[in-house]
């Protein structure tokens, strides 16, 4: 089994022809150490130091230098539309308040299907439609800024040449 320890983000890909493809749903694209199956049946061990979210078009770099392209699988979603931008903002707030993953666009929101949430959104006046599409939700504010872009694995620390002032309150 080949091993992948580096990633090239989709917007940094130079080589147009990957050695293979893996089609993964949104939950499967959030990983740290996991074996994934390529379209041809070959297995690859993804082995990162920290959890990462793979996006459609990203490439995994194998230990032999080959690249595997990640393709987002189509998933069963709800497309949510509001009456106007303010209504969409209100609907987005209710979705976020329930800690649901959401793909937010200027005139609509996508979430994974859940009949209870659908009823709530319709009760709030939303138009909710069943769709099948690639799901690329926003990453949370606390998802971390660390990435493995451009094969960067440096985890060093830098020196501080300034003082740290700590204020303690009793």
Swiss-Prot record:
| SMART domains assigned to the protein according to its UniProt record, in alphabetical order | UreE_N
Q: Where is this region: Disordered?
A: 144-170
GO molecular function terms listed in the Swiss-Prot or TrEMBL record: nickel cation binding; unfolded protein binding
Its main localization is: cytoplasm
> What keywords are annotated for this sequence in UniProt?
Chaperone, Cytoplasm, Nickel
Return the SUPFAM superfamilies for the record.
Urease metallochaperone UreE, C-terminal domain, Urease metallochaperone UreE, N-terminal domain
Keyword Ribosomal protein part of the UniProt annotation: no
Give the signal sequence positions. Answer: none
Q: Which InterPro entries match?
A: UreE, UreE_C_dom, UreE_N, UreE_N_sf
Stated name of the protein: Urease accessory protein UreE
């Amino acid at each position: 089994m080949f091993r992948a320890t580096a990633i090239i983000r989709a917007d940094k890909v130079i080589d147009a022809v990957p050695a293979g493809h893996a089609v993964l749903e949104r939950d499967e694209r959030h990983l740290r150490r996991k074996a994934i199956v390529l379209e041809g049946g070959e297995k690859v061990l993804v082995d990162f130091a920290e959890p990462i979210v793979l996006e459609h078009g990203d490439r995994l770099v194998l230990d032999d230098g080959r690249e595997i392209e990640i393709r987002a699988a189509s998933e069963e979603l709800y497309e949510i539309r509001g009456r106007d931008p303010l209504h969409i903002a209100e609907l987005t707030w209710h979705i976020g308040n329930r800690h649901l993953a959401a793909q937010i666009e200027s005139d609509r929101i996508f979430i994974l299907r859940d009949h209870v949430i659908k009823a709530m959104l319709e009760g709030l006046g939303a138009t909710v439609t069943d769709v099948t599409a690639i799901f690329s939700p926003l990453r949370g504010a606390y998802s971390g800024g660390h990435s493995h872009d451009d094969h960067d694995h440096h985890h060093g620390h830098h020196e501080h040449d300034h003082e740290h002032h700590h204020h303690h309150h009793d």
